[in-house]
Every structure is written in C-alpha cells, then in structure tokens.
From Swiss-Prot:
Keyword list, A-Z: Cell inner membrane, Cell membrane, Chaperone, Membrane, Protein transport, Transmembrane, Transmembrane helix, Transport
Pfam families assigned to the protein according to its UniProt record, in alphabetical order: 60KD_IMP, YidC_periplas
Lipid bilayer topology: Multi-pass membrane protein
Lineage, uppermost ranks: Bacteria, Pseudomonadati, Pseudomonadota, Gammaproteobacteria, Pasteurellales
Record-given protein name: Membrane protein insertase YidC
Length: 542
C-alpha cells in the first residue's frame, strides 16, 4: 500500500510539474520579454522573397519597395493590403481585444518591429511576381467596408501587362475570418499564357526557449494527403526546407490562440515548401501551372484564414485545419470535453459556470472509479494489522513475506493496486481538461464573476488558488492514509502547499476546475465513507 501511495504522489507531482512548466513557457513574463527583444532586433521587408516557379532553380531577391495601402473591413476582420503585390500586411481581429478592457483590436498579421505577413501571387512563364519586382495593383478606393445587411464584399485589384489583365480579388464574408483570394487572368493576346499561383506566410524567425518537457509552440504547420497535421517549427525550417508534393493540403503559422493559413485549390496538385532567409521564416504552397489559351481567361482560387482558433469554422474552411487547436496526445479525450464545454456554455452563457458544469459531469462519470478507489483503500487499511504481524513474523525473508501477502490479498479479495489505478486512469482526463482550457480561445478575456474577469489569466488576488489549497488540505485530512514512512508523510503534508504555490500563476479557469473537482470529491468521499462505515470498514483517518 505504501508503494501505491508513493506512485500516486509521484504521478500527481509529475502532472503538476508538467503543467507548471507549460504555463511558464506560455505566460512567463521574462520569456515573453526575451521574445519581444528578439522580435524588435529584426526589421525585414514585407515585400519580395517570392518563391521560384516549378521550372526554376533560383529564389527571387528581396524587394523592399512598398506601394500604398488599402483597408478592407468586415464586422469581425480588418485587413490592410499593400497594393505592391497585393500582400496582406496587417489583420485586426475586431471581436478580440489586444488586452483585457482595451478597445484596441488584436493585431495578428503585422509589419514593423515584427514581420508577420501573408503573401500571394503568380510566378512562372507569364507570372507577374518576378526578379524585376512585384505588380503594382490598381484599386478603385482606399477603404472598403462591409455594409449593413450585406453578407459578402468583393474587392478587385487589377494589373495589366503585355496585353494580359490580372485581377486579384479579396472576398470578405460577414462573421468569418475565411477570406477568399482569387486570381483571374484574362489573356487578350494571340499567344498562350502560363502562370503558377503561390501563397506564403512570413514571420520573424524566433529562437526556442523555455521548458524541455512541454514547450509552447509558435511556428509553422502543414497538412498533406499523407499527413493530416504536422508541425514544422522555425528550427525545423533552419535545418531543412520543406518540399512536399500533395493534392489539396494547407500551410499555416500558429501561435497560442490564433492562426494564419493559406488553403490552395483542394482539387489541385500543390507543392508545400519552407525556407529561412535573413532572419525571416517562410512557409507556403505553390500550385500547378495554369495555361490560358489566347483570348480566354482562367480563375485560380485560394483561401486565407487569419483569425482565432475557431474549431467549427476552421473545420468548415478546410479539412484538418481545426487540428491546429492542438490538444497533444490527449486529443481524443479533449475534443469531446470541449464539445461538452461549449454545449453547457450555450445554456448557462458563462464560461466559468460551463467549467463547473463540465467538472460535475466528469466527476459524476468517474464516480464508480472513485468509489472503487476508496473502497479498495479502506480494505487495505483493514489489512494493515495482519500485514504488520507478517513483517514481525518473517523479518528479512522478503520472498516468504511477498508470498504470504499475495495469499492474504487473494483470500480477502483485495487488489493492492485498486486504490491507485483509478487515480492513474483519471490523470489523462485531467491533462485533457488542461489542454482544453489552455487551447480554448473562447476563454480568452472571458469573465466569471466578481474579480475573475479573464479565465485565461491568473487570479489577480490569488483567492481561487488559496481556496483550492484549502480544499486539497481538507481532502487530504479526510482521506485514509496508511503511510508510516516519515519522508512520505512529510511529502503528503506539504502537497497542498506545493500545489497552491504552483496554481498561484495558473489560468483561473484551470484553478476553478481543480477547486470544483476537490469540492465534489469531498462530498463524494463523505457519502462513500458513510456507506463503508455501515459495512464495518473503518475508512476514516483516526
């Protein structure tokens, strides 16, 4: 039984350590300051660095020239377009504030101290994105706003060269972060025209830092016919360039709650690529060659997602794009938990209450395991006098002692792992809940009650962590403990203190879950113990 308790302690401490190191990497101010310093140390061009066509071997040189900017605005998204090349050089997410209680929208794509842009264009035989430069598109006005009652807005930008009219059109939809970016090539000449589309995302190259166990992730990702979802970090890009031929697929740049992704024509054969150059990481796709006969035209489609990790809408945008909400190895548990969380929130209209609701549902489902755990521990406690008698009788004869103990367990129908196994089974569920709360953009700046105005941030007054520690201390006092080893006793005594310290800086949503879970467990234990005592099993601590 002592070994079971030791295993339980080590397991809980391991889970706590992993979660704490993950939080440090995600939110530690010192690390964030280091990242900001790294970003501000580099200023790179948002134009140029166009990929080579499939029949070329060179990369287009950087071009620092910039045209004028055009603003496109829907109800949830504001894009800033550079008319030189038609690149998206800024995206403001109007439904997400940069800071709590701020009226400034969150800026995802941006230029300046940090380069983070979405580029697209046409290369190839008659491509207009070449060594000589990028096309200077013409547009009717500088600002376009989606009107009331209008569900969609199309903004065409035109460029004409050698008798060929190129039109790049951005289509914004109400309530959506999915932007259609289409090229129409109208060949008004007597010769055949060949172009090849591309889309790429460029980001200032960041160095890895923080935890070795569960590092946070800001970097590239892609999907292909062979691989539904795979991360490709900045460090991976520095080591080797991606070069994958695939039908369909997409490329993306991820950060905590947000993602930018290019989704090419899903019926075409595309090439996924990456590279690093002058402190800039690039991940993109290149589509197949499109041939336009004389006096005809062709349209090449693509989609740009630049917004929050909205699983439902991303799933509708492209296959596997919702996998950018990365739940780690516990995804098969986390996905239904998130579905349950959103369902409850739709009823109670408060994410904090939804977390409490999810906790109640999970603890109710796990109640049979909890009951089995405490029943087994109570039975083990009843056997302690007999086990102690065996120790005195057999002394250092460990083999005989082990044989007699197994015989005793068999006679009494007690599983020595019965008290520990249910907890080990529940640990993956807790880890899945952790990732669910950490990855849910819905919890960002979501209020609970009173002083808790952001469930994704720490409790500013540390009230929830202290309550959690108190509930854990009470739970420990109620739990049967046959531990006699002084070291183990000290570890168990200080566990509530250690957990409280860990949770001081955890997101309040996660602390709320743990506090609620402890309170429910206290009630369940009281019911279980009362029932066990009626059966003559003295389970309470004396």
């Amino acid at each position: 039984m002592n070994s079971n308790r030791s295993l339980l302690v080590m397991g809980l401490l391991l889970v706590s350590f992993l979660i704490f190191t993950q939080w440090q990497q995600d939110f530690n101010p010192e690390i964030q300051a280091q990242k900001q310093a790294q970003q501000q140390a580099q200023v790179a061009s948002q134009s140029g660095d166009v990929p080579a066509a499939s029949n070329a071997n060179t990369v287009i040189a950087e071009n620092a020239t910039q045209g004028k900017t055009v603003t496109l605005e829907s109800d949830v998204l504001r894009l800033t377009i550079d008319t030189l090349g038609g690149d998206v050089i800024a995206s403001d997410l109007l439904a997400h504030n940069a800071e709590l209680n701020s009226q400034t929208p969150f800026k995802l794509l941006q230029t300046g101290a940090t380069t983070y842009v979405a580029q697209s264009g046409l290369v190839g035989k008659n491509g207009i994105d070449t060594n000589a430069g990028r096309p200077q598109y013409q547009v009717a006005q500088d600002t376009f706003v989606l009107a009331e009652g209008q569900n969609e807005m199309s903004v065409p930008m035109t460029f004409e060269k050698d008798g060929v009219l190129y039109t790049k059109t951005f289509v914004l939809k109400r309530g959506s972060y999915d932007v259609a970016v289409n090229f129409n090539v109208k060949n008004q000449t007597a010769a055949t025209v060949e172009v090849q589309p591309y889309g790429q995302i460029k980001h200032t190259l960041l160095e890895s830092s923080g935890s070795l166990t569960m590092p946070t992730y800001t970097g590239g990702a892609y999907s292909s016919a062979e691989t539904n979802y795979k991360k490709y970090s900045f460090q991976d890009m520095e080591k080797a360039n991606l070069d994958i031929n695939t039908k369909a697929g997409w490329v993306a740049l991820l950060q905590h709650y947000f993602v930018s992704a290019w989704v090419p024509n899903q019926d075409a054969e595309n090439t996924i690529y990456s590279r690093t150059n002058n402190g800039i990481a690039t991940i993109g796709y290149r589509g197949p060659v499109t041939t336009i006969a004389p006096n005809s035209e062709a349209t090449i489609t693509s989609q740009l997602w630049t917004g929050p990790k909205d699983q439902k809408e991303m799933e509708a945008t492209a296959a596997n794009l919702d996998l950018t909400v990365d739940y780690g190895w516990a995804w098969f548990i986390a996905k239904p938990l998130f579905a349950l969380l959103t369902f409850i929130q739709s009823i109670v209209t408060n994410w904090g209450l939804a977390i409490i609701g999810v906790t109640i549902v999970v603890k109710t489902i796990l109640y049979p395991l909890t009951k089995a755990q405490y029943t087994s521990m109570a039975r083990m406690r009843m056997l302690q006098p007999k086990i102690q008698e065996m120790r005195e009788r057999f002394g250092d004869d460990r083999q005989r002692m082990s044989q007699e103990m197994m015989k005793l367990y068999k006679e009494e129908k007690v599983n020595p792992m019965g008290g520990c196994l249910p907890i080990l089974i529940q640990m993956p569920i807790f880890i899945a809940l952790y990732w669910t709360f950490m990855e849910a953009v819905e919890l960002r700046h979501a209020p609970f009650f009173g002083w808790i105005q952001d469930l994704s941030a720490q409790d500013p007054y540390y009230i929830l962590p202290l309550l959690m520690g108190a509930s854990m201390f009470l739970l420990q006092k109620m739990s049967p403990s046959p531990v006699t080893d002084p070291v183990q006793q000290k570890v168990m005594t200080f566990m509530p203190v250690m957990f409280t310290v860990f949770f001081l800086w955890f997101p309040s949503g996660l602390v709320l879950y743990w506090l609620t879970s402890n309170i429910i467990t206290i009630v369940q234990q009281w019911l279980i113990y009362r029932n066990l005592e009626k059966k003559g099993l003295h389970s309470r601590k004396k």
